[in-house]
From Swiss-Prot:
Species, as recorded: Danio rerio
Gene: tmem167a
Name of protein: Protein kish-A
Keyword annotations of the record: Glycoprotein, Golgi apparatus, Membrane, Signal, Transmembrane, Transmembrane helix
GO CC field: Golgi membrane
Pfam families, sorted: DUF1242
Length: 72
């Protein structure tokens, strides 16, 4: 099933996007900072969420990992 129609898969994709953008911004900040608006601004916003809400994002990643491991 597609990640759009499955809520758990959609949350997993969003969490991975946030974590990946925050990691890329920590390595090369200029790559995401030049695109703050428009379609590519989504990646900058995800990086900001990952930086500012990092304890919450980490907790959500742990919960999601446990859910994926122990579901079914």
């Amino acid at each position: 099933m597609s990640a759009i129609f499955n809520f758990q898969s959609l949350l997993t994709v969003i969490l991975l996007l946030i974590c990946t953008c925050a990691y890329i911004r920590s390595l090369t900040p200029s790559l995401l900072d030049k695109n703050k608006t428009g379609f590519l601004g989504i990646f900058w916003k995800c990086a900001r969420i990952g930086e500012r809400k990092s304890p919450y994002v980490a907790f959500c990643c742990i919960v999601m990992a446990l859910t994926i491991l122990f579901s079914e």
